């Protein structure tokens, strides 16, 4: 149940939980009646924003609690603190749980949330691959389950659910399950069953990511970022270009030297001056990038979609395959900002990369270009 750093499935950097009853266009629908309690949201600060975005349409008398299962990573903790403040400013109750504060912390957290989860009519969750989230799912009796993770993992989650497969992150290697996987298998299987619609349970996915394989009975609601656009901006647009970083090196998918060369080449070709670091990028790698490319490294204290809406932001935003090639065009719609994506060359992949990595990453950029008409960027 505790997060092992070597286990990406368990180490979701900021599982947070939320209870929200949300409705209207671009947001999960409100249940007909009944109070709302809390449920597992999950890993990224942006998921708090998505929950708040959907919750703005909830009935005035709905009881809504956002529960943050605090991570240990300082960068993600900082972003979550800011997002928690934003949720409070919007009028929602926020409960901060030090869920990873020692060997007994998970037991205290689960015990403290059990009553809330059992009473919940609706549970809104983020990363369904998180073992913490899967464990909390076994407690709730909610009739409505909503997944609000707009990350690329959403695409894989929905596809695996449709095919009846076990939930495995795309960047993890295949093969036989390890001892921890076998130990946790009953919980994971239970969570997968609960995320399968039935006569007693409705399941919805609230996401801006493209969903091509929809499981029977699952409702897919598009997040068009209308709340983000209404709440922030419009931004001041600068003449230069900005680049969005990725943690593909940290997750063992892309070779570090190849990534550095790609960043250097793109920055020189497009006059890039700033590099918005992913919250999981290592300090050592960022120092090297700054030294060898001359880029200004920016560590955002809010999700990038909010940073971009607040501005200033470059007229061109360069990115590698990631969630932002889908979300930034929505958040910045009507501003004239161009989002350009550089595919990952197969030669950049490490020997430890999952066999599925190249196909999955190509799918992320390919669907984004089709949907949002992004401009592809290739290295000379």
Name each model feature, range by range:
Residues 1-11, 32-175:
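Active-site and donor-binding regions of nucleotide-sugar-utilizing enzymes
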Residues 4-42, 369-380:
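Actinobacteria-biased recognition of intrinsically disordered, low-complexity terminal regions
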Residues 43-47, 72-75, 129-132, 152-154, ...:
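Short acidic, S/G/P-rich loop/turn micro-motifs used as interaction or catalytic elements
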Residues 125, 277, 319-320:
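Short beta-strand scaffold positions
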Residues 156-242:
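A nucleotide-sugar donor-handling region in carbohydrate enzymes
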Residues 241-281:
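Conserved catalytic-core segment of nucleotide-activated headgroup transferases in glycan assembly
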Residues 283-326:
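Donor nucleotide-activated moiety binding/catalytic core segment of transferases
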Residues 351-380:
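Leloir-type glycosyltransferase catalytic cores
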């Amino acid at each position: 149940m505790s997060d092992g750093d070597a286990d990406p499935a368990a180490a979701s950097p900021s599982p947070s939980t939320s209870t929200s009853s949300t409705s209207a266009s671009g947001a999960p629908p409100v249940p007909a009646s009944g109070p709302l309690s809390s449920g597992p949201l999950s890993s990224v600060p942006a998921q708090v924003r998505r929950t708040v975005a959907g919750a703005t349409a909830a009935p005035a008398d709905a009881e809504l609690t956002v529960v943050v299962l605090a991570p240990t990573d300082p960068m993600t903790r900082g972003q979550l603190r800011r997002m928690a403040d934003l949720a409070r400013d919007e009028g929602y109750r926020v409960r901060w749980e030090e869920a990873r504060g020692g060997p007994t912390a998970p037991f205290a957290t689960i015990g403290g949330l059990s009553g809330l989860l059992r009473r919940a009519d609706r549970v809104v969750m983020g990363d369904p691959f998180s073992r913490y989230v899967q464990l909390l799912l076994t407690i709730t009796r909610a009739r409505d389950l909503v997944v609000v993770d707009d990350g690329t993992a959403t695409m894989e989650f929905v596809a695996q659910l449709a095919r009846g497969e076990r939930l495995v992150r795309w960047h993890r290697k295949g093969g036989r399950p390890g001892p921890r996987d076998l130990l946790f298998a009953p919980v994971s299987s239970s969570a997968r069953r609960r995320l399968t619609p039935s006569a007693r349970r409705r399941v919805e996915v609230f996401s801006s990511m493209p969903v091509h394989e929809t499981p029977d009975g699952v409702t897919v609601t598009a997040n068009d970022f209308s709340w983000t656009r209404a709440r922030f901006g419009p931004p001041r647009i600068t003449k230069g270009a900005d680049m969005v970083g990725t943690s593909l090196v940290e997750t063992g998918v892309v070779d570090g030297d190849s990534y550095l060369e790609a960043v250097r080449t793109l920055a020189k070709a497009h006059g890039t001056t700033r590099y918005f670091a992913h919250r999981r990028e290592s300090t050592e790698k960022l120092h090297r990038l700054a030294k060898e490319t001359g880029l200004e490294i920016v560590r955002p204290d809010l999700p990038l979609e909010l940073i971009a809406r607040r501005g200033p932001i470059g007229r061109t935003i360069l990115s590698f395959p990631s969630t932002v090639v889908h979300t930034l065009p929505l958040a910045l719609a009507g501003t004239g900002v161009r989002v350009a994506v550089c595919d990952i060359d197969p030669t950049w992949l490490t020997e430890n990369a999952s066999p599925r990595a190249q196909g999955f990453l190509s799918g992320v950029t390919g669907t984004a270009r089709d949907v949002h008409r992004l401009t592809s960027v290739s290295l000379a």
